[in-house]
């Protein structure tokens, strides 16, 4: 159970937050990296995600604490990702905007952060900023080579992101409406308008 800003975050990808805790000696190895899961050998069993069985993790007490850790962790993750991927990463304006919007869509809508109101939406936005910061730090490590904005490509990207957001908003409304209103939002979801 992750306690963030004094609340248990049950959404936005923070619950259930499976962490291997009990394993036989010699069946686990840990590699260097931020938030890396261990490499396990042998049979793995997950416990049912019951709040009464979960460890309580007092994660972030304040926004300042989140930002401080964000700065430290994103520096490490930018190096890790650059080492793992080809050096010709995409740092175009379109890609940077997609990075933020897609992480937000994933956390707020697909992983239901919006269901926890300000807490869930705030963490969804902070996680989107986290992913953007990793990309910007990778760009920094590559020497800040600036790409010009391709107006057609950028416009196309924004239109695609608008459709995705329209889909997720309509999907959310479908879950909270009944009758004719639900039908209306189902049609909008299908059309992504």
Where are these regions (language model features)?
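Catalytic-site signature of metal-activated, phosphate-bearing donor transferases
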Residues: 1-145
């Amino acid at each position: 159970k992750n306690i963030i800003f004094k609340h248990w975050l049950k959404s936005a990808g923070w619950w259930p937050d499976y962490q291997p805790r009990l394993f036989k000696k010699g069946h686990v190895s840990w590699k260097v990296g931020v938030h890396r899961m261990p490499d396990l050998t042998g049979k793995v069993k997950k416990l049912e995600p019951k709040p009464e069985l979960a460890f309580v993790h007092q994660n972030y007490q304040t926004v300042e604490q989140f930002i401080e850790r964000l700065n430290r962790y994103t520096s490490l993750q930018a190096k890790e990702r650059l080492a793992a991927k080809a050096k010709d990463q995409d740092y175009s304006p379109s890609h940077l905007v997609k990075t933020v919007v897609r992480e937000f869509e994933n956390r707020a809508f697909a992983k239901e952060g919006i269901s926890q109101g300000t807490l869930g939406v705030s963490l969804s936005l902070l996680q989107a900023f986290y992913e953007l910061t990793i990309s910007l730090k990778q760009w920094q490590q590559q020497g800040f080579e600036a790409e010009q904005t391709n107006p057609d490509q950028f416009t196309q990207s924004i239109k695609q992101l608008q459709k995705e957001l329209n889909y997720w908003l309509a999907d959310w409304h479908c879950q909270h409406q009944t009758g004719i209103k639900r039908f209306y939002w189902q049609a909008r979801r299908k059309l992504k308008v």
